Design a protein with these regions (language model features):
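Acidic (Asp/Glu) carboxylate-rich active-site/surface patches
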Residues: 1-76, 80, 86-91, 95-156
């Protein structure tokens, strides 16, 4: 009689799976242990979340691909943070990434948790072809309004 792999062992195997048609998922599908079924459910969920991230990344990348196809080799992504004159300056960042950039979690900074932003930052900086940061002070915001201050910051 063949000895069953422990749930811990199965968990270790499933951690590396990235495709829904992986033979291990089929192998463990009929395992009646509650812990194994829970692991399978978690693995399928992880795979689906990853597939969604990839699809969203490809959708965001579509604009860059269009620009690249027209001969524009350097496309900057721009994001801003700041809450206006009461809370401080408005800060903008522009980043030019290489065509083969593949950190799929990169998104609007306001949609990412602080932990995720801090985890992605070194990867972005390491792979970026260029980075620029602009700041407009509260006094500038007071003088020309938040929208114009944001635009001015983006030009820096």
């Amino acid at each position: 009689m063949e000895k069953q792999l422990t749930i811990k062992g199965i968990k270790s195997q499933l951690a590396a799976i990235s495709q829904e048609n992986d033979p291990l998922l089929i192998l463990y599908k009929d395992d009646r242990r509650v812990g194994v079924q829970k692991l399978l459910k978690q693995t399928y969920k992880k795979i689906q979340q990853h597939q969604l991230l990839v699809a969203q990344f490809q959708q965001r990348l579509a604009l860059e691909k269009e620009a690249w196809s027209q001969g524009l080799n350097f496309v900057a992504g721009i994001d801003e943070v700041g809450r206006g004159c009461l809370a401080g300056p408005v800060i903008t960042a522009a980043v030019i990434l290489p065509h083969d950039f593949s950190v799929i979690e990169v998104n609007d900074s306001k949609q990412l948790s602080r932990h995720t932003r801090e985890r992605l930052y070194p990867q972005i900086i390491e792979q970026a072809l260029a980075v620029s940061i602009g700041v407009s002070s509260p006094s500038v915001i007071d003088q020309i309004n938040i929208l114009q201050a944001t635009r001015q910051s983006m030009k820096k």
